[in-house]
């Protein structure tokens, strides 16, 4: 059973498996703590033998932790987390991301969005995988405190507009200054790569 469980956990490093299972791995004390706070932590994986026998804790050897971890020198703790529902929940301040490909950029954008009070993020299908280890690390836990959906923007934007959300996009050509835009209660901002 143990070997099978480890094999299944290693498979979570693969996007296809993450999508099929609705699960993903996070590395390190901070990320595990943030996942727990958000109620998304299903299983803690640790090399700390003093945790043996605790509920929802799997104690593994250092060599197994190295197989599971994304980093060369893993921290002694990881977690298996479940993905949130892919449903729009908040309409007051929405950040729409169109084609963001760089994992570090996506993570930084998500951290900034949380800092600026956004609760809802919409990602186009061609954005980098949200559960890519580099994205998760660069969010520093912000990913656990945002509602994030992946959907076709040609469906989402008209739906938001029907709900009275003003949609504002960045553009290099024929654009108005951000200073000229009047703030409304419901706004969505579109950013590209």
Please annotate each region the language model reported:
Residues 3-48, 127-128:
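Boundary-proximal intrinsically disordered activation/regulatory segments immediately upstream
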Residues 29, 46-51, 83-84, 172-173:
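Short, polar loop motifs at secondary-structure junctions
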Residues 47, 59-61, 80, 124, ...:
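Generic beta-sheet signal
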Residues 49-56, 86-90, 181:
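Short loop/helix-cap segments at secondary-structure boundaries that form the rim of catalytic
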Residues 53-64, 185-187:
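Active-site regions of enzymes building and remodeling cell-envelope glycoconjugates
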Residues 64-102:
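Hydrophobic alpha-helical segments and helix pairs
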Residues 88-175:
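RNA substrate-binding interface of SAM-dependent RNA methyltransferases
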Residues 169-193:
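Active-site/ligand-binding-proximal alpha/beta "capping" segment
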């Amino acid at each position: 059973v143990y070997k099978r469980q480890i094999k299944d956990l290693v498979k979570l490093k693969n996007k296809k498996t993450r999508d099929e299972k609705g699960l993903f791995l996070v590395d390190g004390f901070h990320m595990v703590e943030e996942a727990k706070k958000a109620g998304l932590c299903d299983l803690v994986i640790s090399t700390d033998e003093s945790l043996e026998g605790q509920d929802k804790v799997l104690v593994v050897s250092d060599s197994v932790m190295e197989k599971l971890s994304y980093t060369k020198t893993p921290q002694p703790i990881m977690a298996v987390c479940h993905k949130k529902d892919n449903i729009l929940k908040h309409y007051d301040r929405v950040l729409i991301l169109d084609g963001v490909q760089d994992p570090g950029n996506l993570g930084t954008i998500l951290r900034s969005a949380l800092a600026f009070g956004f609760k809802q993020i919409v990602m186009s299908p061609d954005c980098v995988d949200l559960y890519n280890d580099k994205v998760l690390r660069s969010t520093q836990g912000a990913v656990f405190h945002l509602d994030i959906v992946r959907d076709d923007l040609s469906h989402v934007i008209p739906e938001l507009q029907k709900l009275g959300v003003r949609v504002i996009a960045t553009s290099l050509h024929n654009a108005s200054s951000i200073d000229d835009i009047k703030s409304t209660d419901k706004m969505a901002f579109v950013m590209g790569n």
